[in-house]
């Protein structure tokens, strides 16, 4: 199978080690899921628990994920009690009001970017060092197709999710040699309070089944899809089996990543 894009290697050219998952209390692996009291986060938390994970749930409240002191205290308390964190699912997030960029309120616009970028960054910054110390772990960032293209009516959300993809890539690069893997998960359009309240989805009759999301999270958490570290996977289009087969066939260096191809004269090539 191919190595993920920009895989760090050691001085002898060997690929970095696979993450170690030994488990926390009672030998069960430990997951932290933000925004887990409802919607996608709740589905993910329940699926992980059914699969034998110990799940630490973050609420949907905005303040905690953007409050550095609160995040660091919560993570430290989890590690003190459980001994380790094997999986972080950055799910908590908000969308901006669906208005034209030129009519947007600057405070509302920035709040969306702050929650959807600063929140995952603070969680990643607090959790990943513990993963490194324990021999590895996995980070799943709940992203969206909005990261792939600009939006006039949801500009803050699009900007934030593009930035989140860069955070995933940075986590991959910083953590790979330490056994840490990071993924962007596009959940499709799951029927939740948030999506039902969006004008963009008014009248929608077809929704992504939550099980398609949770199946991918469980596969990513298990290590079966580690070749996809730094890349996007999409519920409703991908399955664990299809992703494994694609990786076995060989992934392109920039496949499913955000890369601007400038050609041979690219100054950063």
Predicted regions and their residues:
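The beta1-alpha1 cofactor-binding region of Rossmann-like NAD(H)/NADP(H)-dependent oxidoreductases
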Residues: 62-73, 106
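Conserved glycine-rich cofactor-binding loop
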Residues: 37-38
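Catalytic Tyr-X3-Lys loop
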Residues: 102-121, 136, 140, 164
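Conserved mid-core segment of classical short-chain dehydrogenase/reductases
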Residues: 72, 95-110, 153-156
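Active-site helix of classical SDR
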Residues: 124, 160
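C-terminal helical subdomain
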Residues: 184, 202-269
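Residue(s) in the substrate-gating loop at a strand-loop-helix junction
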Residues: 144
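Active-site-adjacent segment of SDR/Rossmann-fold oxidoreductases
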Residues: 149, 170-180, 224
